[in-house]
Amino acid sequence: MTDLTVVILTKNEEKNLRKCVESFRGVAKRFVIVDSFSTDGTEELCKELNSELQSIGSSLDFYQNKWISYADQLNWGLQNTCIDTEWSMRMDADEEIMEDLATEIDEKLPNVKAPVNGIILRRRVYFMGRWIKHGGRYPELLLRIFRTGKAS
C-alpha cells in the first residue's frame, strides 16, 4: 500500500463516492472526505467505507466544513486533517482511477525522489460510457498527486 492520502470533496455524493474510493482499494493508505454538509447518505456511507477499509489496513476520515469555494475547501482539507503520508492526491467524488493507473501508482510512487514534488496525470473524460478521445478532451493534463506539504 502506498504512503498516499486521497482527499475527496463532497456534497451529496452518496451515489458516486463508493466507486471512487474502491478504485483506490489497496493503493491509498488513507482517505480524507471533506464534506459540505451533505443531506443525502454521504456521511453514513463514509462510516461504512471506513469499516471496510480498516480490514485492509486503510482508513477513511470524514470532516465537514462550510463551502466557500473549491480552492478554499481543498486547502482546508490539506491544512486541517493531519495528513501525515508522504504523498497526497486530490480527487472528485465522481472520478475514479483505472486499474492500470492504480497499479502504476502503487509500484512507482514510492520510488519518486526529490526534487520531484508533483505528478501530472492524463485524465480520460467519459460521457455516457464512452471515452471522448478528440475535441481537445484528451489528454487533459492535471496535477493531481503531490508531496504532502508542497501544495496549497
Show which residues each predicted segment covers.
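Short beta-strand/loop segment that forms part of the nucleotide-sugar
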Residues: I8-L9, K29-F37, Y63, A93
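A conserved acidic beta->alpha catalytic loop
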Residues: S23, D35-L45, W67, D92
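Conserved donor nucleotide-binding strand/loop of the catalytic core
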Residues: E43-N80, D84
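Short, well-formed alpha-helical segments that are part of the catalytic scaffolds
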Residues: I8, N12-V27
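Catalytic-site signature of metal-activated, phosphate-bearing donor transferases
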Residues: A71-L78, T85-M91, I97-S152
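Acidic helix N-cap motif at the loop->helix transition within catalytic regions
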Residues: R18-K19, D40-L49, D100-L101
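Extreme N-terminal starter segment of soluble prokaryotic enzymes
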Residues: M1-T5
